[in-house]
Design a protein with these regions (language model features):
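Classical eukaryotic N-terminal signal peptides for Sec-dependent ER targeting/secretion
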Residues: 1-11
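Long, position-biased, composition-driven segments near the start of the mature protein
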Residues: 2, 15-345, 349-388
Length: 388
């Protein structure tokens, strides 16, 4: 049996049809992300198309794109799962830690989990980050599938000279060094096909948002579309040109170069900095493009590194099931810290409880030639602080 035929077993039919919201983040919890596509199977495309019809939370545009590129959907699912993991990693010490109380409803093809749904459909700064990193995750995952050959409808970039790149590095004797000058080189190896990933992500996310804005004039669609662009640009603007030197005794007489996108954890970190320092509040109304709320800068278009939001964020201090906020009660904090993980900030002035836990940790680590680090296991009593 084809692996994707197995997925259908996890999407049982339901007698009662329930209208479910559009939220493609639901792909993160489907078994589709666990499997590699098998395009060599004669029934492969039929199985994928049947799966597309039963995936819940996709917009009509996403359903159509799934039908056209069914083998790409597992990579989208893997990408959004990685996006959510990185989101939780980047915000683990913030009041909003990229988690929420998700509603589970019975849809036409089984239970539907509305992952971060209220945040996903809002226009806060947190929603901006979520839109940006999920968009970037599609670009990264699809591009990686092209480069590795696991996604057969694309391959390496045949015209890397048309891509932008920010950093140039040489690989020489296993070492990497950033170059300060430009020398002759030839394109070789397998350059990451970022343009293909960007194009797919734009189709998957933006076409429906633009169509809905044209119909409803709801600015939230333009906000999400812009933040999707910010996520894509975080990858496209940070592609690296990497080169391998050839010559006698590493003289680097000639170089072979290729383009490589940044690691996804680097993208997540870049987007977190843009969330913290380059988030711009925009007006609630727009004709064709977003406008800054600050009247003095209203004529300045939003840049590709600026996230857009409309609503001010709630405090996230207290639990509020109505809007899906978990609150910070019970969260572990650091006493004496001056960062966002400090007990003063994370506990919102409510104070904290302290308990002593016995933990096993690595200690007395030593470097052993060559090339290993050996550590002992130490049992320590640790003071753990949690918010009241």
């Amino acid at each position: 049996m084809d692996l994707f035929a197995i997925i259908l077993l996890f999407l049982p039919h339901c007698a009662v049809l329930t209208e479910i919201p559009y939220n493609w983040l639901n792909l993160a919890v489907l078994r589709a992300s666990d499997y590699q596509p098998r395009t060599d199977h004669w029934r492969g495309r039929q199985v994928y198309e049947a799966l597309c019809k039963r995936l819940q939370g996709l917009t009509p545009h996403q359903q159509a794109l799934c039908q056209q590129h069914p083998a790409a959907i597992p990579f989208v699912a893997k990408g959004v799962r990685e996006a959510l993991l990185q989101c939780q990693q980047q915000f683990q010490f913030d009041r909003w830690n990229c988690s929420s109380r998700d509603e589970v409803t019975e849809g036409p093809h089984g239970p539907f989990q509305d992952i971060l749904g209220r945040t996903f459909r809002s226009t806060t700064r947190e929603a901006a980050y979520l839109a940006a990193i999920s968009s970037a995750s599609i670009v990264h995952s699809i591009t990686k599938g092209c480069t590795t050959g696991n996604l057969t409808e694309c391959g390496c970039d045949s015209k890397p000279n048309l891509q932008r790149y920010a950093i140039e590095e040489d690989i020489l004797g296993g070492q990497r060094r950033q170059r300060a000058n430009i020398e002759q080189f030839s394109w070789g190896g397998c350059s990451d096909n970022v343009p293909y990933g960007v194009k797919f992500a734009r189709k998957f996310l933006d076409e429906w948002e633009q169509e809905q804005f044209n119909k409803t004039k709801d600015v939230s669609h333009l906000v999400r579309k812009h933040n999707h662009f910010v996520g894509r640009e975080a990858i496209a603007q940070n592609v690296r040109k990497q080169c391998r030197c050839h010559g006698v005794s590493g003289s680097c007489e000639f170089r072979t170069c290729w383009l490589q996108m940044p690691k996804f954890v680097e993208v997540a970190e870049m987007l977190k900095k843009r969330y913290e320092h380059f988030a711009v509040q925009v007006t609630k109304r727009a004709k064709k493009r977003l406008r800054r709320k600050d009247r003095a800068e209203r004529g300045t278009p939003l840049r590709g590194n600026e996230m857009a939001y409309v609503q001010r964020s709630p405090s996230y201090c207290e639990r509020n099931d109505t809007i899906g906020i978990l609150g910070t009660s019970g969260r572990e904090c650091k006493h004496g810290s001056y960062e966002s993980d400090s007990c003063d900030l994370l506990c919102c002035g409510r104070g904290f409880n302290t308990r002593i836990e016995t933990r096993t940790q690595q200690c007395h680590c030593k470097f052993v030639w060559c090339c290993e680090v050996k550590c002992e296991q130490c049992i320590e009593d640790v003071a753990v602080h949690t918010c009241k």
